[in-house]
Design a protein with these regions (language model features):
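Bacterial N-terminal signal peptides that target proteins for export
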Residues: 1-5
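Outer-membrane beta-barrel porins/channels
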Residues: 17-35, 99-497
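Outer-membrane beta-barrel translocator/receptor signature
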Residues: 39-47, 53-139, 155
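N-terminal signal peptide c-region/cleavage motif recognized by signal peptidases
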Residues: 11-14
Length: 497
């Protein structure tokens, strides 16, 4: 059981974090995510806490976003040392359904003129679950050889990913203060709770033969790796330098998640029969994942008539410093012991895997138009679009993380009556199709010597012991739906009407 091949686990685990899709909340999503300056509902605790100062009285928000994510991978044929095709692979697709992303928050001024306080709970706006087949044409079982041992029955993407669940919830406590008529500031404390489950395979001999597979499960057989508490913070400000103009900005410093739990490693029956053993079984480990600086900024222009906002347009930019997320670490305690009759014993204390991620930026343009009297209430129409630069270089492309270049278009509507607002939103994200021919993901055998950091299979001296597993065609398509309920209780209960 080569130590080097296990490092592929981290390549998949690292990308379980993903990036958010634009964007949280029914109003903001329908505007293409352009909300850093407007921030006039309780999703301000996600975009810009200074926006809480705009919201008087006591309020409640319950929004639900729903992510329909479709991923596919057509692995490139496996070639022999002379370049002849040894094996062709079927295209595989993710089998997940619609993933819900709830958002709940409440706020009150508690009778104070300048202060607003809020509390809420939400998660990243992304699909936390991704599932791909383990087997092709047969039902998977729970044995060390889940597809029966026949090579053609094993899914071609199994070395990248078969299943992952990455769930993070931010319990948030925030406050905003109106410094002056033209300036609001806000800050918040967040309690991050996170869980990880991941399953994939690696190969002990640098081939694609299932007889050499090792199945890896972060979270063990039935559990999860858990980080029960990591503190996070956010600050923001909104300025109104001229009539009808707002400028907003917010920043969240980086944070480090430390997921503790079991790691189960199951060698194939062939490897077990040949004397490969891994202990302890299951192992105990900590998966260390870093989340980057996130800085948002936006400027908007709006028009009001007798205190009622009739229309607005906003342009936002977001910067995420993913280059500082340089490694993902898996720390074993106690150390992992790998015994092999052929290769002897080795001890593993920590894997440290480089990411290759780059800083990324995005632009969001959106706005709304409101009709003051439609029946007993007001009707708001919203639309927007966005562009996001890639986080993930082409040679680091794989299935656990889709930080690719993408474009989005969105639209939605809302109806408000006596302090109660019902909102709907829809967005579609177009991802670039990625053709990868020089992947950094491979299986390899320490008998031949592992590649140095940054090498690919073409750099390995004895390439027969190195098999590229990430070359091929990657496609992604995302549909986002949102519904929302907002209640302003002071307006709802106003009996003077």
């Amino acid at each position: 059981m080569p130590r080097a091949s296990l490092a592929l686990l981290l390549a998949a685990a690292a990308r379980a974090a993903g990036v958010d899709y634009p964007d949280q909340g029914a109003q903001a999503m329908a505007r293409g995510g352009a909300f850093a300056a407007k921030a006039d509902d309780l999703t301000a605790i996600y975009y810009n806490p200074a926006g809480l100062a705009k919201q008087g009285g006591t309020r409640f928000l319950l929004h639900g976003n729903f992510v329909d994510q479709r991923l596919s991978f057509a692995r490139a044929p496996r070639l022999d040392s002379g370049g002849a095709v040894q094996q062709r692979f079927d295209e595989v697709e993710s089998t997940d359904g619609i993933y819900p992303v709830p958002f709940v928050a409440a706020s009150s001024r508690f009778g104070l003129d300048r202060w607003t306080f809020a509390a809420g709970l939400y998660g990243p706006h992304t699909a936390g679950n991704r599932t791909f087949p383990k087997c092709i044409g047969v039902e998977a079982n729970d044995s060390p050889d889940p597809c029966g041992g026949e090579e053609e029955n094993y899914a071609p993407q199994r070395y990248l990913l078969t299943h992952q669940e990455f769930i993070t919830a931010f319990g948030t406590f925030g406050a905003a203060y109106r410094v002056a008529r033209w300036l609001d500031v806000g800050a918040e404390f967040q309690w991050a709770y996170s869980t990880v489950v991941l399953e994939k395979a690696t190969n002990a001999l640098g081939s694609s033969l299932p007889s050499s597979d090792v199945i890896i499960r972060l979270g063990g057989e039935d559990g999860k790796m858990v980080d029960r508490f990591t503190p996070a913070f956010m600050v923001g400000a909104i300025a109104r330098p001229a009539r009808g103009v707002e400028i907003g900005a917010s920043a969240r410093p980086p944070l480090t998640l430390r997921h503790e739990g079991e790691v189960d490693l199951t060698p194939s029956q062939t490897l077990q029969d040949s004397g490969v053993a891994i202990s302890p079984d299951p192992a105990r480990a900590t998966l260390v994942m870093r989340l980057p600086w996130v800085v948002r900024g936006g400027v908007r222009y709006f028009r009001e008539e007798q205190g009622f906002e009739t229309w607005d347009v906003e342009l936002d930019g977001t910067y995420e410093r993913y280059s500082v997320v340089d490694t993902i670490d898996l720390e074993f305690e106690p150390s992992l012991q790998v015994d092999s009759e052929a290769l002897g014993a080795s001890t593993i204390e920590v894997f440290r895997d480089p990411n290759g991620w780059s800083d990324t930026w995005s632009a969001r343009l959106g706005g709304g138009y409101a009709f003051r009297r439609v029946g007993p209430g007001a009707l708001m129409l919203r639309a927007g679009g966005n562009y996001e630069a890639p986080t993930q270089p082409l040679d680091y492309t794989q299935l656990g993380f889709t930080g690719w270049k993408r474009f989005g278009a969105a639209a939605g509507a809302a109806y408000r009556w006596r302090g109660v607002t019902l909102s709907l939103g829809y967005s579609h994200l177009w991802h670039e199709t990625r053709e990868v021919t020089d992947t950094r993901f491979m299986t390899y055998d320490t008998v031949a010597g592992p590649p140095a950091p940054g090498q690919r299979c073409r750099d390995v001296e004895d390439a027969i012991h190195c098999t590229p597993i990430g070359n091929g065609t990657y496609r992604a398509s995302i549909d986002l739906f949102a519904v929302g309920l907002d209640v302003a209780f002071d307006e709802l209960l106003d009996r003077s009407r």
